Amino acid sequence: IIGGDECNINEHRFLVALYTPRSRTLFCGGTLINQEWVLTAAHCDRKNFRIKLGMHSKKVPNKDEQTRVPKEKFFCLSSKNYTLWDKDIMLIRLDSPVKNSTHIEPFSLPSSPPSVGSVCRIMGWGRISPTEETFPDVPHCVNINLLEYEMCRAPYPEFELPATSRTLCAGILEGGKDTCRGDSGGPLICNGQFQGIASWGDDPCAQPHKPAAYTKVFDHLDWIKSIIAGNTDASCPP
């Protein structure tokens, strides 16, 4: 996270970290949405990874931290054909449920779509420098604004993004606050609701007039609920 500060230890009980067991590298975030399921970005998928819940500092473990491995992973259309503007979403079933504790509690799915102009909070253990490989020991949090989708489309003509999309655009137009490498898959929380999954942005991060894109959770609710209910053939919205 660029331009943020250390998150309050109590404000991210639903935030999980995806990491590789050997190198202990945190490569993505995710959101616990109930005792057994985590929502993150499809591009965060790796062959072998673990999920750390209830974590704050990488160096000083919370007593109630839990580790899980993915039992099942679900993608849109049961394929990994996501693009920059579509279907960058992955639902992970944990190998065993987690109980609520001091630093672990799921975040409910949104009850209504977000509105442009909302203040949104982003969080993660990703880079805190736009240009250097500087990663914090604790998650950083910062507030950004929900922008018109066009503001993510116009600055990136090379991506040929479609006129409408199931992504949200969020950032600060003057730059300086943004998600960055390592924050992918983490939540975008607008007016207290879990509305987005960090998907992609510019490199270097946090440049003026280069906001980032987030998968729109609200548009995928039917798919998420169907998978959790056991209908594993469900497909994402077209």
Swiss-Prot record:
Coiled-coil region(s): none
SMART domains hit by this protein: Tryp_SPc
Cysteines joined through disulfide linkages: 7-141, 28-44, 76-236, 120-190, 152-169, 180-205
Pfam families linked: Trypsin (PF00089)
Ranges where the Peptidase S1 domain occurs: 1-229
InterPro entries: Peptidase_S1_PA (IPR009003), Peptidase_S1_PA_chymotrypsin (IPR043504), Peptidase_S1A (IPR001314), Trypsin_dom (IPR001254), TRYPSIN_HIS (IPR018114), TRYPSIN_SER (IPR033116)
Cross-referenced Gene3D superfamilies: Trypsin-like serine proteases
Tissue: Expressed by the venom gland.
One GO BP annotation of this record: regulation of blood pressure
Glycosylated residues in this chain: 81, 100
Annotated compartments: Secreted
A GO term from the CC aspect: secretory granule
Primary location group: secreted
Complexes and interactors: Monomer.
Sequence similarity: Belongs to the peptidase S1 family. Snake venom subfamily.
Note from the entry: Negative results: does not coagulate human plasma. Does not inhibit platelet aggregation induced by ADP or collagen.
Protein name: Thrombin-like enzyme halystase
Source organism (scientific name): Gloydius blomhoffii (Mamushi)
